[in-house]
Amino acid sequence: MGQVLPLVTRQGDRIAIVSGLRTPFARQATAFHGIPAVDLGKMVVGELLARSEIPAEVIEQLVFGQVVQMPEAPNIAREIVLGTGMNVHTDAYSVSRACATSFQAVANVAESLMAGTIRAGIAGGADSSSVLPIGVSKKLARVLVDVNKARTMSQRLKLFSRLRLRDLMPVPPAVAEYSTGLRMGDTAEQMAKTYGITREQQDALAHRSHQRAAQAWSDGKLKEEVMTAFIPPYKQPLAEDNNIRGNSSLADYAKLRPAFDRKHGTVTAANSTPLTDGAAAVILMTESRAKELGLVPLGYLRSYAFTAIDVWQDMLLGPAWSTPLALERAGLTMSDLTLIDMHEAFAAQTLANIQLLGSERFARDVLGRAHATGEVDDSKFNVLGGSIAYGHPFAATGARMITQTLHELRRRGGGFGLVTACAAGGLGAAIVVEAE
């Protein structure tokens, strides 16, 4: 076991998570169509503060993330402060770590708490895949800049004459890695082939995710942590996630064609997480501040870890890399965990990471560790379903997972939970939480 790194303040206070909330998650271009991420962020933070009944001045910092950036609101965190009735003096800044963005937001607020610069803060994220920053071609962008500097009409017309019809076509946000040109689904296909993961295994995991998420909603387990969203023009509220397919069968999954490698692939729309709109946030405090306010924490941060690997091959292995480091810093092993919640970007990616967590060879030859991190106990794994079912508003997923895990730990009488995710750019994140 390596060095244990306790997450405590200089006074010995633990970092408490006192509350968490999210919007329902909606598939692209459905219930939240036309609502930008900044408005989803305001929606969830405003409701979180109202439910917690914490005075606005108690919150000293808000760290929020957004992956699909909107140029007109580059600092989503500050816009949320200004748009929710929070104290205007609240420090606010934005972060981005792809699919692990709200993991980073939580870590940043925790570090402010440990440094003693604040005693309470909010962390979270929001994304909209329905309101996208549609851009212009590089050539058109350059011409427009030059036109703005031109002094005469003839100069402007000459500049415009350089353009061709193709230069005028709108450019949607990139869906591929900037450095490699590979789409996330291409990487998932790589991983399926590298680790021998079959189409049947992927479909089975996706089906499991939907069934468990549907059961969680049916049992009322998510009601406390998901707000009802009232959507302009306020005629139709959204109270539940709208991607979950509780009535599907494995035969339904088998009907879909591969989405990326059309000839030989196994990754489909059904065994991948869909483009999604939504927001999620958590309130963090020092343990003593929570006691002063008479608040009973949902749980506490035990450790966190971030890792990075190469992007050319099998880059979505973040959980296999970050989990052993987070467990080491927490002073725990896999067997100590009550729950394991892994982000399901793709079924292939999820199954590959599960495989490598239990691999002695991977631990020894790749991580340089003496033993495997540990086998993943299916009875502890994604017990309420995962991102394939709920959806994945990129910056919101981490906060959803943390809140969901802490609520489930409390229902089970406490224990330790691991929350982990892969992210674009070969990044990985893992957070260990505990509940009493």
Swiss-Prot record:
Disulfide bonds: none
CDD domains: thiolase (cd00751)
Main location: cytoplasm
Molecular functions per Gene Ontology: acetyl-CoA C-acyltransferase activity
Catalytic activity: an acyl-CoA + acetyl-CoA = a 3-oxoacyl-CoA + CoA
Keywords: Acyltransferase, Cytoplasm, Fatty acid metabolism, Lipid degradation, Lipid metabolism, Transferase
Enzyme nomenclature, EC number: 2.3.1.16
Pfam families given in the database record: Thiolase_C (PF02803), Thiolase_N (PF00108)
Sequence similarity: Belongs to the thiolase-like superfamily. Thiolase family.
The protein's assembly and partners: Heterotetramer of two alpha chains (FadJ) and two beta chains (FadI).
Protein's recorded name: 3-ketoacyl-CoA thiolase
GN (gene name): fadI
